[in-house]
Design a protein with these regions (language model features):
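Active-site metal-binding loops of divalent metal-dependent hydrolases
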Residues: 13, 260-264, 383
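Active-site-proximal segments of metal-dependent phosphoesterases and phosphodiesterases across multiple
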Residues: 219-234
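Active-site neighborhoods of enzymes that stabilize oxyanions during catalysis
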Residues: 115-116, 286-429
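His/Asp/Glu-rich, glycine-adjacent segments
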Residues: 61-220, 339-355, 374, 388, ...
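A structural signal for short, well-ordered beta-strand segments and their strand-loop junctions
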Residues: 10, 41-42, 129-135, 205-209, ...
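Extreme N-terminal starter segment of soluble prokaryotic enzymes
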Residues: 2-6
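Short, structured active-site-proximal loop/turn typified by the sulfatase FGly-forming signature C/S-X-P-X-R
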Residues: 20-72, 131
Length: 446
């Protein structure tokens, strides 16, 4: 018997607490799904930033294997900053044309590891039809031309591919008002496309990405975001349920995985990570955004990562730094260090484990450090702090994410009709592939 078709719903930035309150009745569509599924709190990756997290969801591997390290990073080979959209000011600082190219094309076409198979590639290699709506990690086998006449460069996505109105594999009539992001325009667009797809039963697998909750959470904080954006999120979920003929008909037709990519915590203060490292400005490149930062050593650097980490000991915005020394990772916090490395029965450690007293912190830190595009020193922000981006912007007074702390790292995970105990966002794609019986090859296990 063929596997039931599957919808993956990703609500950007929704915390477990927000989902749990929604499931108590504040959001009818989410409450309906919660009543019919298995729910648990799961764990994101580090840095808990959208490009990194969505790449982990789409590939089923951590950043050490998929190679997307952050929202903003230093490209060692091309000797330039890559900026995926921390803010408009950051895009302008990095170069708008290059940043748009990096975000729309290069993240999938050049930066995402060719060895990390996406869920769309894996399923369509089995003869299934995959669809993606607005998700920024979209790499597939099908060539798509942009909808804008003067933009001619193609992107490769799944057979049914919808990307903020710029790429549309099918004419759906869905409106896309980029300038009304605060009014929920991206989720309205997703809902219109999702309704069109479900009405036609036009896929075997759908990645349905809803981003407006995160936008509201950055602006107002994770708690007030529920008042601003929860109804919009719920309406977008209700749209695809109604398109199937109602809740029972929807679940008769589709299995469901619902998750967030990361959590969100309240931010009260902003800091520039570059400031305490200013004496080494000609030896390093600092890239920071939200609640995670990176420091890259230039070839001429005389300073080492241990000295840089010690320099950050007294910075209130910094909770922990991470670096590699030999075959070990070193986490440093308030002059204390923890050394760790993978071992055949788990982890070999030396030092105070409380330095990384966060969800799945050893594995998440190791994967981040293994990323060939990551900085030589990684920095996780302290509670209540955020690092200003290239344009000097931060979300003080609102919400943010990116660090190792629990609030940034925990996500809601709900499954309906999908086997397996999914506890991490990296386990979503393996579960989806298993659901459809898609084979796994050696390269997928990196």
């Amino acid at each position: 018997m063929p596997a039931k078709k599957l919808v993956l719903i990703v609500v950007d930035g929704m915390t477990p607490a927000a989902f749990e309150r929604a499931a108590d009745g504040r959001a009818p569509a989410l409450a309906f799904l919660a009543a019919h599924g298995e729910y648990r709190r799961g764990t994101s990756v580090f840095p808990s930033l959208t490009p990194v997290c969505l790449s982990s969801i789409a590939t089923g591997v951590g950043p050490g294997a998929h190679h997307i390290p952050h929202l903003v990073w230093w490209h060692r080979g091309e000797r330039r900053i890559v900026e995926y959209g921390s803010s408009f000011s950051a895009l302008r600082a990095a170069g708008i044309a290059q940043s748009i190219t990096d975000t729309v094309y290069n993240m999938n076409g050049a930066h995402l590891s060719a060895q990390a198979t996406t869920v769309y590639e894996a399923l369509e290699d089995e003869g299934l039809v995959a669809a993606a709506v607005n998700i920024t990690c979209y790499r597939g086998r099908t060539r798509h031309l942009p909808t804008i006449p003067w933009v001619t460069k193609a992107a490769f996505g799944p057979k049914r591919f919808f990307y903020y109105g710029l790429f549309e594999s099918d004419a759906t009539g869905a409106p896309m008002a980029v300038r009304n992001r605060a009014g929920g325009s991206t989720d309205l667009y997703a809902a219109a496309v999702g309704r069109w797809l479900v009405t036609r039963d036009g896929f075997d697998f759908l990645a349905y990405y809803l981003s407006d909750f995160d936008y509201a959470s950055h602006a107002y904080g994770p708690d007030l975001a529920e008042d601003v954006a929860l109804a919009r999120t719920d309406a977008a979920v209700q749209a695809i349920i109604d398109a199937a003929g109602g809740g029972d008909a929807f679940l008769e037709r589709y299995a469901v995985v619902l998750a967030s990519d990361h959590g969100q915590t309240r931010v009260e203060r902003g800091a520039r990570l570059e400031t305490p490292l200013a004496p080494f400005a000609d030896e390093i490149v600092v890239t920071a955004s939200n609640r995670a930062g990176q420091v890259y050593l230039l070839p001429r650097a005389r300073v080492d990562t241990a000295e840089l980490a010690a320099r950050l000991d007294d910075e209130p915005a910094v909770e922990v730094t991470l670096r590699i020394e030999g075959d070990e990772a070193v986490a440093r916090r308030e002059r204390e260090e923890l050394r760790f490395r993978p071992h055949f029965d788990g982890w070999q450690t030396s030092g105070d484990l409380s330095i990384l007293d966060h969800p799945d912190a050893l594995a998440r830190s190791w994967s981040a450090l293994e990323n060939p595009n990551a900085g030589d020193l990684l920095v996780s922000a302290a509670e209540g702090w955020e690092f200003a981006d290239l344009g000097g912007r931060h979300h003080a007074g609102g919400g943010s994410h990116g660090s190792l702390v629990t609030g940034d790292s925990e996500v809601p995970l709900l499954t309906i009709g999908v086997s397996g105990d999914i506890g991490r966002i990296t386990e979503i794609t393996p579960a989806v592939r298993a659901h459809f019986g898609a084979r796994v090859v050696a390269a997928d296990a990196v």
